[in-house]
């Protein structure tokens, strides 16, 4: 279990079917998704080197891509997106009066979400020139950019193979075509958001509104797909079900809040908790929300200084980073950004309440109640 989840006061020891706390669900789902990813890699990825590189990325192999003993494996992420889809799936089933589904019908889709997310991380690390991911060397820093691009491409293709999964059998797969289409749409939106993010690096006219449009694609597209797709499978592919827009809105708002919190951690997060060097976003002059808010709120002199620093074409020095931090503190940029994260969290909870059929129904549905708790964690996490 990633260190960032330790603040969720519980012990992960129950199965997904009987779990009663958020951390129980997350632990059970993560174990199930990891097992499914391993099966997908074995069944779909023929090249052993690619399987090794992917296993390394997930923390299951060393830098030589040789599998590690279970006790030595690194934490490979939170499995947040699969958990979102599975909790929405089970929550929507519960709302219809059905018992928790032990047949794993939503597992292939949840697995595909995690593979798409990780393909994007491998490519993001290349584009951002990041040397660390989850406290370990990034894939590209070990095998080079060209091979790492190929590893990411392999993961993206494997995601769609995973989504088909056992639904290839006759009679299975109600709604599978729709969630595959949703996953493809989310992938396209993610690339559009990433293009905007890269474009921001060389522009000096980026606004807060442009930022929100960017993260709606880069981050929120996949969380929207997760919550919408999970609910859609529970409603057996009934695309016109009135609850589905609320599930989609929940995922979108949660994804927006998640990315804003990520921006805060990119400046003020601790390396021991984020797995990345503290202040990396400042040194790369990323126009994240705290910086854009500072440019909007700063005095003319401070705005000019910050603009000049972010117009540089090289990574900032230590003194220059300190200057940026001083300006951000003067403008209370961290608190302002957190307000935006909290606002999106509140909007996510409102949408979730609508999806549940009201506040009482939300509290009475253990899966959706866990999503309520997860929303609070996402917008206040430290890693």
Show which residues each predicted segment covers:
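Conserved N-terminal diphosphate/IPP-binding helix and adjacent helical/loop segment
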Residues: 1-112, 122, 126-141, 197-199, ...
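Structural helix-adjacent loops and short alpha-helical linkers that scaffold large soluble proteins
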Residues: 44, 170-174, 298-306, 360-361
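Acidic (Asp/Glu-rich) catalytic motifs at the cytosolic membrane interface
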Residues: 116-133, 257-269
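Alpha-helical phosphate/pyrophosphate-handling elements in metalloenzyme active cores
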Residues: 2, 52-112, 162-163, 209-254, ...
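All-alpha helical catalytic cores of prenyl diphosphate-utilizing isoprenoid enzymes
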Residues: 44-51, 74-79, 149-150, 157, ...
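Divalent-cation-assisted or electrostatically stabilized phosphate/pyrophosphate-binding catalytic cores
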Residues: 133-155, 204-218, 245-249, 271-297, ...
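Short acidic/histidine-centered micro-motifs embedded in hydrophobic/aromatic stretches
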Residues: 53-57, 112, 129, 182-186, ...
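A glycine-biased, small/acidic residue-tolerant capping/turn segment at secondary-structure junctions
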Residues: 48-53, 131, 265-274, 303-308, ...
């Amino acid at each position: 279990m990633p260190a960032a989840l330790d603040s969720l006061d519980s012990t992960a020891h129950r199965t997904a079917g009987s779990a009663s706390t958020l951390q129980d669900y997350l632990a059970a789902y993560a174990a199930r998704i990891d097992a499914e990813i391993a099966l997908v890699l074995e069944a779909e990825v023929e090249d052993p080197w690619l399987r090794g590189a992917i296993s390394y990325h997930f923390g299951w192999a060393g830098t030589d891509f040789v599998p590690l003993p279970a006790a030595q494996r690194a934490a490979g992420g939170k499995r947040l997106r699969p958990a979102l889809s599975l909790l929405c799936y089970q929550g929507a089933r519960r709302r219809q009066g059905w018992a928790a589904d032990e047949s794993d019908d939503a597992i292939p889709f949840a697995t595909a979400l995690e593979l798409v997310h990780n393909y994007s991380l491998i490519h993001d690390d290349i584009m951002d020139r990041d040397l660390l991911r989850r406290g370990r060397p990034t894939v590209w820093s070990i095998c080079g950019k060209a091979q790492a691009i190929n590893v990411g491409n392999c993961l993206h293709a494997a995601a769609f193979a995973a989504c088909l999964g056992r639904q290839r059998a006759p009679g299975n797969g109600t709604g599978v075509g729709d969630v595959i289409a949703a996953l493809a749409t989310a992938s396209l939106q993610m690339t559009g958001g990433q293009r905007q993010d890269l474009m921001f690096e060389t522009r000096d006219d980026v606004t807060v509104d442009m930022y929100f449009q960017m993260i709606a694609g880069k981050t929120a597209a996949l969380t929207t797909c997760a919550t919408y797709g999970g609910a859609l499978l529970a409603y057996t592919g009934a695309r016109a079900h009135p609850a589905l827009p609320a599930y989609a809105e929940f995922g979108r708002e949660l994804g927006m809040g998640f990315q804003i919190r990520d921006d805060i951690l990119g400046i003020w997060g601790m390396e021991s908790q984020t797995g990345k060097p503290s202040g990396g976003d400042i040194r790369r002059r990323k126009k994240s929300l705290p910086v854009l808010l500072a440019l909007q709120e700063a005095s003319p002199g401070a705005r000019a200084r910050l603009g000049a620093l972010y117009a540089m074409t090289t990574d900032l020095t230590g003194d220059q980073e300190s200057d940026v931090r001083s300006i951000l503190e003067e403008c209370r940029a961290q608190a302002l950004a957190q307000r935006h994260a909290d606002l999106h969290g509140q909007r996510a909870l409102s949408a979730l309440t609508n999806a549940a059929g009201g506040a009482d129904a939300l509290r009475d549905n253990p899966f959706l109640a866990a999503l309520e708790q997860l929303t609070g964690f996402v917008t206040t996490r430290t890693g």
